[in-house]
């Protein structure tokens, strides 16, 4: 009996968890091909903050090493950028790290492209020394900058921004957190709790500039970012600017393929898109109007999606109740 062909675009936690669940219940049903844009196997993105803080190494946060893919008969293309999903011919077209074109046919397609950091459109956002905080490459850049420079500015005081600020402070940088609200983590905390947390973080050496709107990032003589200028005319020095201003579902490929998207790839309770051969899980998916950015919902999606791919599709994803944890204070 011919195995079905399953192609997965994306090599992150939600997608690989789906493959793990699928292998448990239908180990021989699919020939699986995975495309990952990063040069690393699947790792725990949540633990990038301890890596930045010097508490863990990159190797410590690898969830599925290269041997796992080989042991499970999965064809893995790392550093490969998928350029097109051809739904008419049911194929995925990608460019590998050597610039060669790869075309792989599918019977089922799983899109797990995650999200991309939102970079506000202020002038200077493309300067050297201006980064987001999303992956191993970003973390390595911040670790390198902390060893060479003094002043860091983190734009955004949500969970990710505060964890970045904490890691940079632990590595010896003078860190200023810039936020356009009255208190930090305003989506999770009320004013009193936000002010209390800010006071604790100030004891750790962080500075805060609240109700601030960035006007531009200014270059120094070397061409690298040197300062952050605000709309009130104030400015502060910055050898490194980490922008943590939120994320956006990565749906460009799906939209280009004509798959219905609305703040994410719209999926039903079995994680299928409007094309029933195409599934989506993780931060790129929008289920009942919500795109989840936390691990627990993504793993719940993975289990339902795997059951349906295995044609044991009685399970339904009903949505998730979420909570968050800030990893900076203890």
Predicted regions span which residues?
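Beta1-alpha1 glycine-rich phosphate/pyrophosphate-binding loop at the start
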Residues: 2-75, 167-188
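A Rossmann-like FAD-binding core segment of flavoenzymes
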Residues: 31, 73-97, 104, 170-267
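Short hydrophobic core segments
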Residues: 9, 104-114, 155, 236-246, ...
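Residue-level detector of alpha-helix initiation sites
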Residues: 13-16, 39, 115-117, 137, ...
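Glycine-rich dinucleotide-binding loop and its adjacent helix/turn
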Residues: 113-171, 267
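FAD-site-proximal beta/loop scaffold in flavoenzymes
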Residues: 126-149, 220-229, 233-307
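Phosphate-coordination loops involved in phosphoryl transfer and adenosine-cofactor binding
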Residues: 3-5, 79, 148-151, 211
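Mid-to-C-terminal Rossmann-like scaffold of FAD/NAD(P)H-dependent oxidoreductases
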Residues: 1-5, 24, 284-330
């Amino acid at each position: 009996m011919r195995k079905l062909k399953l192609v997965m675009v994306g090599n992150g936690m939600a997608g690989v968890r789906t493959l793990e669940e699928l292998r448990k219940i239908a180990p021989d049903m699919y020939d699986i091909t995975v495309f990952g844009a990063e040069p690393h196997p699947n790792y725990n993105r949540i633990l990038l903050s301890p890596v930045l803080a010097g508490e863990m190494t990159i190797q410590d946060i690898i969830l599925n090493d290269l041997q796992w893919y080989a042991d499970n008969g999965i064809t893995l293309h790392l550093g490969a950028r998928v350029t097109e999903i051809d739904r008419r011919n049911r194929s995925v077209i990608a460019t590998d790290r050597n610039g060669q074109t790869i075309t792989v046919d599918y019977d089922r397609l799983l899109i797990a492209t995650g999200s991309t950091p939102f970079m506000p459109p202020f002038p200077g956002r493309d300067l050297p020394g201006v980064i987001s905080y999303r992956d191993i490459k970003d973390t390595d850049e911040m670790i390198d900058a902390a060893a060479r420079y003094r002043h860091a500015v983190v734009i955004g005081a949500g969970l990710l921004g505060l964890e970045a600020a904490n890691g940079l402070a632990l590595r010896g940088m003078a860190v200023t957190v810039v936020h356009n609200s009255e208190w930090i983590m305003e989506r999770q905390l009320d004013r009193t709790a936000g002010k209390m947390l800010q006071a604790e973080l100030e004891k750790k050496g962080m500075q805060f500039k609240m109700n601030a709107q960035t006007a531009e990032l200014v270059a120094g003589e070397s061409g690298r970012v040197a300062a952050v200028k605000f709309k009130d005319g104030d400015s502060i020095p910055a050898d490194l600017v980490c922008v943590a201003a939120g994320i956006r579902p990565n749906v460009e490929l799906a939209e280009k393929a004509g798959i219905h998207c609305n703040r994410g790839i719209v999926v039903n309770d079995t994680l299928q898109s409007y094309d029933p051969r195409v599934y989506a899980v993780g931060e790129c998916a929008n289920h009942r109007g919500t795109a989840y950015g936390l691990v627990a919902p993504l793993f719940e999606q993975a289990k339902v999606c795997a059951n349906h791919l295995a044609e044991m599709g009685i399970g339904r994803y009903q949505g998730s109740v979420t909570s968050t944890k800030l990893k900076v204070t203890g």
